[in-house]
Amino acid sequence: MEQNVFFLPHEGLKLAELAEFLGAELANSDHSDVIVRSVAPISRARAGDVCYILSRRNREEFATCEASAVICDKALADVVPPHLPVILSSNPHAAFAMAGGLFYPAALRPVAISGESEIAPSAVIDPSAKLEKGVIVEPLAVIGPHAEIGEGTRIGANSVIGPDVKIGRDCSIAAGASILCALIGNGVVIHNGVRIGQDGFGYAPGPRGMIKIVQIGRVIIQDNVEIGANTTIDRGAMDDTVIGEGTKIDNQVQIGHNVQIGRHCAIVSQVGIAGSTKIGNGVQIGGQVGIKGHVTIGDGVQIAAKSGIMTDLAAGGQYGGIPARPLKDYLREAAQQVSKSKLRGRNPGGKQND
């Protein structure tokens, strides 16, 4: 790949320094002084790059690999060609992610639109708002009355922070986001176009049509949450909408009013979560999953992409399909359908015996 002007390579680290940072082990101390500057996939890694492997199936990709180091666990070390330095880690994927963050710290947060180091002249900040030391406000951002923003937080261009909103320290609010009726913890990352705290979808059928139900709750976002671009999180109706500590939400996810999401969950793009759903800790939800309102999903649940959740899901299970059922049942049914389809294809128009 040609030089990437958006993310420039690191000035360089010795492999011994990188291994120490990762809490890993350099397989051969003779390689301690090898310099690395970047991360890359194994198939196109070049001198100065670090890559990683998770399977023996990666063996063939070493044919085009010119990396300066490979991260893997001890069981796969024999797959790596002998001339390549090896960093041994019990969790190569996590170690590779840590290396990427070390080489490219700026890529861990939304890209700044301007070079502002303080408050842009065109930003609109209500006199009653409280900004701690080191807050950066980019051009045309608006911060409402009595809002509070913690030290080291960056407010992106054209973003809107509503009245009385509280944002913690070391947060990144990207360009074009809007935040209303919300309390946000420390270290939170909110990407471009996110909408937080708008009306939930609440109506009561009446004799002359729909009657709006007031939405008077809040959104609570705990520490170290990351929210992807154009995701929408409605404020609670009478209770709060809560996103638990460390949870990561992809782009274009809709979270309805009163939803409670636990800690360290992962929610992939285009998921829709209807109101008052409760999701436990460590839950993983695949893309385009639809979740009915007022259901409870237990801790550690994994949900396959495109599933429809209509009932409560027990903790620790894997589920898939519409309506969702245990994943092994769903996969068995899918295999049976494929088998039946192939049989019909071999005997078009044929009669079936009763």
Swiss-Prot record:
Catalysed reaction equations from the record: a UDP-3-O-[(3R)-3-hydroxyacyl]-alpha-D-glucosamine + a (3R)-hydroxyacyl-[ACP] = a UDP-2-N,3-O-bis[(3R)-3-hydroxyacyl]-alpha-D-glucosamine + holo-[ACP] + H(+)
Location of region: Disordered: 335-354
Keyword Transferase in the entry? The reply is yes
- EC numbers listed for it are 2.3.1.191
From the Swiss-Prot or TrEMBL record, what is one GO molecular function term? N-acyltransferase activity
One of the GO biological process terms: lipid A biosynthetic process
- The answer, when asked if Lipid biosynthesis is one of the entry's keywords, is yes
InterPro entries reported in the protein's UniProt record: Hexapep (IPR001451), Hexapep_transf_CS (IPR018357), LpxD (IPR007691), Trimer_LpxA-like_sf (IPR011004), UDP_GlcNAc_AcTrfase_non-rep (IPR020573)
* Domain of life of the source: Bacteria
Name the pathway: Bacterial outer membrane biogenesis; LPS lipid A biosynthesis
Keyword list, A-Z: Acyltransferase, Lipid A biosynthesis, Lipid biosynthesis, Lipid metabolism, Repeat, Transferase
- Catalytic residue list: 257
Q: Which family does it belong to?
A: Belongs to the transferase hexapeptide repeat family. LpxD subfamily.
Assembly description? Homotrimer.
Q: What does this protein do?
A: Catalyzes the N-acylation of UDP-3-O-acylglucosamine using 3-hydroxyacyl-ACP as the acyl donor. Is involved in the biosynthesis of lipid A, a phosphorylated glycolipid that anchors the lipopolysaccharide to the outer membrane of the cell.
| Protein name per Swiss-Prot or TrEMBL | UDP-3-O-acylglucosamine N-acyltransferase
Organism of origin is Rhizobium etli (strain ATCC 51251 / DSM 11541 / JCM 21823 / NBRC 15573 / CFN 42)
